[in-house]
Amino acid sequence: MRKLLYVAALFVAASCASGPPPDEVAAQAAKVYYDQLLAGKYDQYVDGFYCPDSLPNSYREQLIVNAKMFVGQQQDEHRGIREVRIVNAKADTARHVADVFLVFAYGDSTTEQIVVPMVEQEGVWYMR
């Protein structure tokens, strides 16, 4: 009986020490990136995209302009995005990728579910 309790205690300690599951970490990262977009921090949103090489400055500026245009379009069509919620996430730890399902709650009371593909690089989750 004592051995069983010892093994159970080891299992609980190991599971607690491992941290949150990768799908939860990817989901939180995706939400943070979209929260930055909604807060008008377009450069930080763009920095959330995975780029194995450095981006030319002109291309990065285009991505920032596109992000601003997207927010403006959502404002025109739906009175803006009020909130971003995490619905679900599925991670493939062998391939270091995840699909995060988010819901946009719009100002006109409609919602839309989107899928954000994510990739993990050196312990950081980025949007693809």
Model-derived features: where do they sit?
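Exposed beta-sheet edge and beta->alpha loop/turn motif
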Residues: 83-128
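N-terminal non-globular leader segments, chiefly Sec-dependent signal peptides
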Residues: 34-38, 47-53, 96, 100-104
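Sec-dependent bacterial lipoprotein signal peptides
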Residues: 1-16
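Short, low-complexity N-terminal intrinsically disordered segments enriched in polar/charged residues
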Residues: 16-39
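Short solvent-exposed beta->alpha transition segments
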Residues: 27-28, 43-93
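Short, compositionally biased low-complexity segments
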Residues: 3, 37-42
